């Protein structure tokens, strides 16, 4: 697992149109020691924030108005490019097999269904961030 000192350097972008969901996710992340957290209620701003913030992990809701998580997942995956790995974790209340398959096919690295177990969620976040760090180290 990652050393605690590495947590403060990791940047997390959380995109969800529900303020209560953002608050819960941020509370769990902050409790785990993450401090570089950006949140977005409006998925239309996600590409701009992604490019400016350069996150190490994106946490993305699927069911949002106007621009849904699937369309955004596709856009963000194309922005990362082939020579970079920015994992995307999907957070969704949709437990259908179709939703999971579609999100994974579009590039999601993990899927967590709401409501989620906070301990499991924290472990999954840490695992994806460790993957990101290993990828960055390998590129050096």
Predicted regions and their residues:
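C-terminal output helix
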Residues: 98, 116-129
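Short amphipathic alpha-helix used as the core "switch/output" element in two-component signaling
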Residues: 48, 70-83
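Acidic, metal-coordinating helix/loop segments flanking the phosphotransfer/catalytic sites
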Residues: 39-57
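The feature encodes the CheY-like receiver
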Residues: 39, 65-66, 92, 96, ...
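Two-component/phosphorelay signaling modules centered on CheY-like receiver
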Residues: 19-38
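Active-site residues of response regulator receiver
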Residues: 16, 61, 92
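Alpha4 helix (beta4-alpha4-beta5 surface) of REC/receiver domains from two-component response regulators
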Residues: 23-27, 71, 84, 95-110
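Acidic catalytic/metal-coordinating carboxylates
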Residues: 20, 42-45, 63, 68-74
């Amino acid at each position: 697992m990652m050393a605690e000192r590495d947590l403060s350097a990791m940047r997390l972008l959380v995109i969800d149109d529900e303020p209560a969901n953002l608050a819960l996710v941020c509370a769990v992340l902050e409790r785990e020691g993450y401090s570089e957290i950006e949140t977005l209620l409006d998925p239309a701003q996600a590409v701009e924030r992604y490019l400016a913030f350069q996150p190490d992990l994106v946490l993305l809701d699927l069911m949002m108005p106007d621009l849904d998580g699937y369309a955004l997942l596709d856009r963000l995956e194309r922005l990362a490019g082939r020579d970079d790995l920015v994992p995307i974790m999907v957070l969704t209340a949709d437990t259908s097999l179709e939703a999971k398959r579609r999100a994974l096919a579009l590039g999601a690295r993990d899927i967590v269904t709401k409501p989620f177990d906070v301990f499991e969620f924290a472990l999954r976040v840490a695992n994806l961030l460790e993957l990101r760090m290993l990828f960055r180290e390998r590129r050096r």
